[in-house]
Amino acid sequence: MDENGTVKPGYELKGLNSGNSRSNMDKDPIVSKFHRAGLNDSADEEDTDINGNRNTSWITSMISEEKRKVEGKSMLNDEEDLHLSKATLNKCDALVKILADIIKLEFVIHQSWYIRSLHKSVLIQFEVETSGGNKNSAGDSGDDDDDNHNGNLDDSFYKDLSLKCIKKCEKSSLALESLSRDIDQIRDFIMSNTIEDNRVDRLLQNSMTLLLECWIYSMKRLRRLRMKIAGIFVRSKLLLIDHELVTIWHFLQEQNEHETVNNENELKLAETIKSYRAFIKIFIQQLEDSESGSPSSSLFEECLHVFLDIESMYNSLNLNWLLNENKALQERLLSPSSTSENDHTNNLPVIDETKEIEDISSFVNSIVDASMLTHDLTPINSSDSDNLSNGEIDRLDGRRLSSSTSDMSLMMQRTSLQKQLPSLLTAFNNARRLEQELQNACKVNDNKHSTKDTDSNIRRNEHAMSSSVSSIISQNSTLASPSPPMSSSFISTAPSQSSSRMSTLPLSPSSSLLESQSQTLKNNMSQWLNQSRSGLNGTKLIPTNHIGFHSNVLNTLYGIGGGPVSKSYKSNQPSSQNT
């Protein structure tokens, strides 16, 4: 390639990888500058300088010089190659911006206080070096370091530091992914204009060579930055694992102090922590060696595989410990010798199903007996008894049930009969109602018998009164006019005045018998009026103001229009009485 960027005829592309061609390429001004700025040179240390623009200034100057050559059209004669060179140089500008972002991200990570503290804490914690900066072996640290570590075990500084560094690694990884996608677009541009177009000779042009060298340099910086972030993550995880192991060890120590159990697990975990720290000490040294070497070295990859093995072993140990701890906790909870469990058991009532059923039966029987006793002790007349509906009885029963003791409620809640108790109470209520109806039926039966006796007495009284009236009429047949009808005396008088009216009649031999029977009739009627008028069918008879007696027999006898009489009573009257 001459100064104008054209390929000489005698230059063969297949000899690019040979020693002579590489020596010739080292003489190229573009390639030689990138080789001198390689990652193994001291120029890499200048990338950590605060002035990030100075790190890419030498690349920017090369791009500007190449742009002036393209604008002057002094090295290209083809219009297509001129357009490609301009596009290639624009890609170089974009790649320089990506490289500047990579350098800034390196600077932020290098100057971060958390990451600096992490590196120092890992070296001290795993005894790679002491706080004075001298490296010591694991055996030289002695018991003093162990006491120092034990004094700082309760400190959560390492835990917080590790978590913050892991979070910073996550953010940096997201930024690296974005930068990697931008660099991949540059690679696709190079591939599409050289290999895919079968124009590999374009790689020998100054603009394409500059873009290719910038891309290779950026990829090396990006790979090294990934190694740094991965190393920070590995150190954070190792420090966090050490903190969690020590936390578990302290937990076992406290558990052994409060409980007289075997401390075998505590001793095993203490030995595990010692061996872990001794192993991590060697591992950290190898990790630092791999980071200081070439990014393409396989030593760093081997360190990553070792770290993955360590992490998987810790996860297995942690999971196994959690399972054992959970099992031991369940055994302690189920153990009858536990004090807290005994206290809890003593607070709970011991349930005996047989005694519980007896208590429930006696409880329901007491409710029924109290209800029956209330009905027996409280005098209720016929009208009040009729007005007491089934809904009111249910409300009374509900109030009685709500007044039961809390111990009974607790017992019913803890038994299997809880679901059946409402149906049992309903059955007892129905039984009580049936018993009341049977009692009412018995009362009506007694009333029927008394009514039959009354009817027989009334028929006897009727016969006697008829004979008396006949004798009176026959004895007073000499009067000019007959006496007024007897019914007129009953229209304006009450049944209670019948005795005085009948006392005005002339005396006869049967007057004493009539008077006694009249008194018996009044007593029977008074008893009848005071009794309940509800039959077996529950028909309610409301007394109304009417003229005459409540008996069709007397109304027929004295010629008075009868009042309302129950159907049950009418059905029992003989048809011969309605004369």
UniProtKB/Swiss-Prot annotation:
Keyword Phosphoprotein: yes
List of residues that carry Phosphoserine: S42
Compositionally biased residues, Low complexity: 495-518
Source taxon at top rank: Eukaryota
Start-end of Basic and acidic residues biased regions: 446-463
Region (Disordered): 1-27, 378-401, 446-518
Segments forming a coiled coil: none
Cellular component terms per the entry's GO annotation: cytoplasm; mitochondrion
Protein name, as recorded: Mitochondrial distribution and morphology protein 36
Biological source species: Saccharomyces cerevisiae (strain ATCC 204508 / S288c)
